[in-house]
Amino acid sequence: MKKVASKWMAAGMALLLAVVAGCSQAQPAGTDGTSSSTGTTTPASSDKKETVTLRFATWDTDQMLKIQQDIAKQFEQKNPGVKVQVEAYADGFDQKLVAAFGAKNPPDVMYMWDFPTYNASLEPLDEYVKKDPSVAIDDFYQGLLNYNRFDGKLFGLPAGFSTRVVFYNKKLFNEANVPLPTDDWTWEDFKSAAKQLTVRDKKQYGFAVRSEPDTYDLQQFVWSNGSSFISPDGKAIEGYMNSKETAEALQIFSDLAKDKSALLVGGKNQQSGNDLFKASKLAMYDNGVWSLESYKKANVDFGTVVMPQFPGKPGKGVIATSSVSIAKDSKNKELAWEFLKFFVSSDGIKMRTSDLPVRISVVQEKKLDQDPLYAPFYKTLEQSTDTPAFLLNPHWNEINRNLSAAVNAIMMGQNAEELLNKAVKDSQKFLK
């Protein structure tokens, strides 16, 4: 799964995409001649049947790539005369995709998350969804669909996701006689537990604070305290990024590191939070589903729970998501839609065992919303109703540089209020 906000495209790349897309005036294709349930197409009659090649670009490698290749083969079996060419771009995904769009030779279907950068080169899917009820759009979680919209249009369908939860070591809790956390716990409960679970002689800590945290992930704590980094319309940061509530949410982590009930991790010459949790040197660690299997393999007796809440305020979540989209310059849009639809169908989802299912029906069938380890991810998903900043302002990349510098300094113990005020002042020019 591509973690959202893990990479940002250069401004030149975004400009290139905008220019390229502006030259393309392709219209949405319909879904006439397609099966409503099997993901098959009905080829036009022809004396000579030629193989149609559909290109699918992915950022995945290894086992996840193998699964996607298997999905492609299944689609080919359902659609004789169709060849799905799976193109593994790996770490060069963005560069190769931009080059393909620039050459007007993009893959027909591709993994996607960065809709602010790529939307001008993508095919809006609203009309496809409207004309084709077999996609069962209401079977997707609404929060995931919200992350696939930009400027009022739907540019992708959800493929995989993770929310963030607290992983906790049951053995360490029990040894310290600290009650296991529950879904109604507060930040005061969290801080108390972290302090009790810290045993410095054993180099054991209650929690780990990332010294250079991703501001994207921090949004859920700010939202949960009733604020945000930017206004809902994306036009203001004064009174949002530097609000009392924002500073309070960020200060929690700085204070944990300051009183030594949390260890700073992930920075230069610092340890990995994941490694420490697997070694039972951390009692709690916030993370996504991607670490779950590695914790199992390390034989850690762990549980998961939703993030703590601020008093009298509902908890909020932020989503790391991957989606699939269609290129506006695709010459096989109808077939691309059928493949996209098959990829996010119940069958396609069940094949992608490394991803959390994105369809409500699959989750209920597998009873993941009742599984103690997986239920917190879905409860947090249902709380993920806010829109992340990068989808609200096209200049968020520039604004975020100033915010990130402030956040990193806050984690090192500097004053949150002063640093956030400076970040707002330095970023005002990007809002004009």
Residue locations for each model-derived region?
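Extracytoplasmic/periplasmic substrate-recognition and gating elements
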Residues: 73-78, 83, 176, 258-259, ...
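Conserved C-terminal helix/tail region of periplasmic/extracytoplasmic solute-binding proteins
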Residues: 40, 174, 180, 255-260, ...
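Hinge/lid segment of periplasmic solute-binding proteins
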Residues: 113-165, 221, 303-305, 370-375, ...
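Extracytoplasmic/periplasmic solute-binding protein
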Residues: 151, 155-159, 164, 189-238, ...
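Extracytoplasmic "Venus flytrap"/periplasmic binding protein-like
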Residues: 74-140, 175-177, 274-276, 283-284, ...
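Short, low-complexity disordered leader/linker segments with a strong preference
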Residues: 1-54, 77, 425-432
